[in-house]
Amino acid sequence: MDLDADFLLLHLSDSALPTGAFAHSFGFETYMDAERITNAEEFQDWLKVLLKVQLTSSDALAMRMFYATPTVSELKRLDERLFAGTPAREIREANARMGTRMAEIVAETYSVPLIVEYLELIQHRELSGHPALALALATHSAGIDVDRAIHAHLTATVSSLIQNAVRGIPLGQMAGQRVMFAMREHIGAAVKRSANLDEIDFCSGDPGLDISQMVHETQRARLFMS
């Protein structure tokens, strides 16, 4: 067992990592405002769609594609495609902020090939930054299996959104934990599903999710930045 690799994975996929994820609902606040998400069950239904469609075809597939071709040119291509394939401005900005912060944390704490170059490209505004790619750089460098890396990233993302729902809807703490436990099989299924996707599936969207994320830009009263 490589304890250093395990530590890196646990550290960088911790939902409490200071990337700013606590400030984003990724559109569920729009459904809250419309009173379509009012309880744990309704939130869980939304979360399953986000995971199955957006997170699987964007974050998970991008990580898998980088692992297949771990080069600077592929990193640039994936970063650009993730940005271009995200319709909602707030989500593009959220990914850029969290991706930049993740890259800064990795560069500060671990010796990872390409991460300094990635961070410089972000800082020079040549790339936008994305947390899934910054994590993939670190996990690939540590020799962590791609499925484990994707599973950890999706778990952390789901956990962050549940924490935001607990204080936003609000939900009880135990209700949030029940949602987290119920999502375990859906996270595993998303990892497996991403292995069967290819280039044509990259950044596949769901009209309802995309529209809710764009509507949030003009929502008058809100707790979250996206």
Swiss-Prot record:
Its main location: cytoplasm. Required for maturation of urease via the functional incorporation of the urease nickel metallocenter. It comes from the Bacteria. GO terms for molecular function: nickel cation binding. It is found in: Cytoplasm. Belongs to the UreF family. It comes from Corynebacterium glutamicum (strain ATCC 13032 / DSM 20300 / JCM 1318 / BCRC 11384 / CCUG 27702 / LMG 3730 / NBRC 12168 / NCIMB 10025 / NRRL B-2784 / 534). Disulfide bonds: none annotated. Keywords: Chaperone, Cytoplasm, Nickel insertion. Induction: By urea and nitrogen starvation. UreD, UreF and UreG form a complex that acts as a GTP-hydrolysis-dependent molecular chaperone, activating the urease apoprotein by helping to assemble the nickel containing metallocenter of UreC. The UreE protein probably delivers the nickel. It holds the Pfam family UreF. This is Urease accessory protein UreF. GO terms for cellular component: cytoplasm.
